[in-house]
């Protein structure tokens, strides 16, 4: 089995769980290369699945990221699925969960163009 662990190049060194996850998958007999989501040389069809890990630059590149996810879901099993991705890119979903009584990490929301400080 071959599963892509999908990241952003800038996030590679910041995702502290990425290498341990990859090592655990290798120990379980799964080939799990770490792949940048925007690497246009990647053939996503060669993977049994693509697991989104640390694609953290999607915020600045949302239309491009969603187009990528749409394309990849037609080539392999995308985890999370596109509909989940589209619902989760706007973090206001956390406030909706909290309003329903679900515990969340304390959160503040900065709107586009707002000073987040």
What are these regions (language model features)?
Residues 1-7, 13, 69-75, 79-117:
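Active-site nucleotide/adenylate-binding loops and adjacent lid/helix of ATP-dependent enzymes
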Residues 9-10, 56:
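Residue-level signal for short, function-critical loop segments
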Residues 17-30:
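A short, Lys/Arg-enriched amphipathic alpha-helix followed by its capping loop at the start of a domain
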Residues 30-73, 79-88:
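N-terminal glycine-rich "phosphate-gripper" loop used for MgATP/nucleotide binding
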Residues 11-12, 47:
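Accessory recognition modules or surfaces
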Residues 16-20, 45, 63-64, 92:
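Generic recognition of short, well-ordered alpha-helical segments
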